[in-house]
Amino acid sequence: MSKVCEICGKGPSFGNNVSHANNKTRTTWHPNLQKVKAVRNGSVKTIKVCTRCIRSGHVTKAV
């Protein structure tokens, strides 16, 4: 569970890189995860959160 957001569950997505010669190679796109000290269930914990969850206010940062 290392590349998964702990709030929304967003994880890696898979697909192909396609060249001009139409060659296809498998690739992986990972979410932009940040380690954040956040308040969860009344205690401060370090969690991995995607930047979309941070920007939209789903995480309350610990001061």
Curated annotation (Swiss-Prot):
Q: Name one GO cellular component term.
A: ribosome
Q: Which GO terms describe its biological process?
A: translation
Q: Does the keyword Transmembrane apply?
A: no
GO: which molecular function terms? structural constituent of ribosome
Pfam families, A to Z? Ribosomal_L28
**Keyword check for Ribonucleoprotein:** yes
Top-rank taxon: Bacteria
* Keywords on record: Ribonucleoprotein, Ribosomal protein
Q: Which family does it belong to?
A: Belongs to the bacterial ribosomal protein bL28 family.
The protein in question is named Large ribosomal subunit protein bL28
Query: Which species expresses this protein natively?
Result: Geobacter sulfurreducens (strain ATCC 51573 / DSM 12127 / PCA)
